[in-house]
């Protein structure tokens, strides 16, 4: 089973969180083997044939067993995950309540068994395909933040977007 989760690296571990009601997170917390993957698509490689067409990407896979974090380590991990997603926002936002902390499982997966794969290049058409009259090359893809959209109920005194949000780039 695969589900998208928020995560952050912390030294030689990856931290991620989910609902304590989730069957998957309960299994991970109980010591079931885990496979965590992250893939970033960088572009489409458009060759002169469907067979030779592919993608440029960066991917990582981590295998192992998770540890469950509690107390101050759990809160520190949630801050780390928050800062990975939204740099600089943790000092401004309301921190998790006791009830929210009870409903959230925070897991730590050591980076002991990892695999990284990168595909970066153009089409590798065989000689006999070069004369085919079709465009070939790479269509790059990049991730970019859009313009911030304020909440409908945002008070007027908070209508100016903070500098740290305007400066977010990936």
Residue positions per predicted region:
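Residue-level signal for tight coil/turn positions that link beta-strands
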Residues: 11, 57, 111-113
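Short, structured beta-strand-loop surface elements
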Residues: 21-80
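Short, surface-exposed beta-strand-loop junctions and turns on beta-sheet-rich folds
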Residues: 8, 22-24, 122-125
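C-terminal edge-of-domain segments
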Residues: 73-170
């Amino acid at each position: 089973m695969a589900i998208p989760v928020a995560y952050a690296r912390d030294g030689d571990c990856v931290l991620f969180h989910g609902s304590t009601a989730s069957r998957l997170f309960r299994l991970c917390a109980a010591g079931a083997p885990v496979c965590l993957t992250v893939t970033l698509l960088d572009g489409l490689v458009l060759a002169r044939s469907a067979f030779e067409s592919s993608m440029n990407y960066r991917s990582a896979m981590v295998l192992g067993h998770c540890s469950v974090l509690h107390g101050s380590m759990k809160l520190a991990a949630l801050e780390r995950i928050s800062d990975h997603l939204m740099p600089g926002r943790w000092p401004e936002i309301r921190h998790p309540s006791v009830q929210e902390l009870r409903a959230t499982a925070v897991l730590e997966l050591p980076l002991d068994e990892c695999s990284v794969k990168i595909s970066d290049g153009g089409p590798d058409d065989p000689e006999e395909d070069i004369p085919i009259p079709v465009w070939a090359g790479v269509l790059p893809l990049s991730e970019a933040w859009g313009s911030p959209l304020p909440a409908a109920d945002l008070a007027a005194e908070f209508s100016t977007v903070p500098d740290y949000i305007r400066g977010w780039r990936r």
